[in-house]
From Swiss-Prot:
Gene: PLX-B
Lineage: Eukaryota, Metazoa, Chordata, Craniata, Vertebrata
A GO-annotated cellular component: extracellular region
Keyword Signal recorded: yes
Keyword Iron: no
Name of the protein this chain belongs to: Phylloxin-B1
Amino acid sequence: MVFLKKSLLLVLFVGLVSLSICEENKREEHEEIEENKEKAEEKRGWMSKIASGIGTFLSGMQQG
């Protein structure tokens, strides 16, 4: 009976440790995805500013 209790505790402990590791990996992946989204949005913002600047420059050259 004592052997079964120890075995059960060991199985529960190993299960909790592996669950904790999985949660940590999932959290890291989620943070990485969010970081990539932020970088992509930042790039889009810069590209639109550059395109707007080029458009303004070209329209100024046509008028002048």
